[in-house]
Amino acid sequence: MERTFLAVKPDGVQRGLVGEIISRYEAKGFTLVGLKLMVVSRELAEQHYGEHKEKPFFSGLVDFITSGPVVAMVWEGKGVVAAARKIIGATNPLGSEPGTIRGDFGIDIGRNIIHGSDAVETAQREISLWFKSEELADWSPTLTSWIYE
């Protein structure tokens, strides 16, 4: 089954949106297999955003993600990477559709509430960066047979 990495950023945690965000993925039928509240180290932030290292906004990304607690999560399910991105909405909240997390709660691109892996390969890299294998639960909810054929 496919897995993706999501992180509720410091603005989402401070605004009390963690429960709302988790509820959206549970209601969709995805399975939460990893969850932790953490303060992100500068080293982890720089690794996570490594692809943007030469871009002018890199230091701002690192400063923001390390500015407060983050809720890191791993979700599992059929097509979860693409579906999670649809639930999140466009990077710029002002361009996000109503009904998406960013469309409903975001205003500014620099405070866009949540990160989600953009591809299966990215998800695998991000999951291994943020979680040890023993921190991920291998389980199936009883409702799985009601969601998948």
Swiss-Prot record:
GO BP, one example?
Answer: CTP biosynthetic process
Q: Which InterPro entries match?
A: NDK-like_dom (IPR034907), NDK-like_dom_sf (IPR036850), Nucleoside_diP_kinase (IPR001564), Nucleoside_diP_kinase_AS (IPR023005)
UniProt binding sites for ATP: 9, 57, 85, 91, 102, 112
| CC per GO annotation | cytoplasm
A GO molecular function term, named singly, is: nucleoside diphosphate kinase activity
The cofactors it requires, by name, are:
Mg(2+)
- Annotated active site: 115
Sorted alphabetically, the keyword list is: ATP-binding, Cytoplasm, Kinase, Magnesium, Metal-binding, Nucleotide metabolism, Nucleotide-binding, Phosphoprotein, Transferase
Q: Which reaction does it catalyse?
A: a 2'-deoxyribonucleoside 5'-diphosphate + ATP = a 2'-deoxyribonucleoside 5'-triphosphate + ADP; a ribonucleoside 5'-diphosphate + ATP = a ribonucleoside 5'-triphosphate + ADP
Which residues does UniProt assign to the signal peptide? none
PROSITE patterns per UniProt: NDPK (PS00469), NDPK_LIKE (PS51374)
Q: Where in the cell is it found?
A: Cytoplasm
Reported EC number(s) for this entry are 2.7.4.6
User: What biological function has been recorded for the protein in this entry?
Assistant: Major role in the synthesis of nucleoside triphosphates other than ATP. The ATP gamma phosphate is transferred to the NDP beta phosphate via a ping-pong mechanism, using a phosphorylated active-site intermediate.
Q: Which family does it belong to?
A: Belongs to the NDK family.
Quaternary context: Homotetramer.
Extract the PANTHER family matched here: NUCLEOSIDE DIPHOSPHATE KINASE (PTHR11349)
Listed name of the protein: Nucleoside diphosphate kinase
Species for this entry: Acaryochloris marina (strain MBIC 11017)
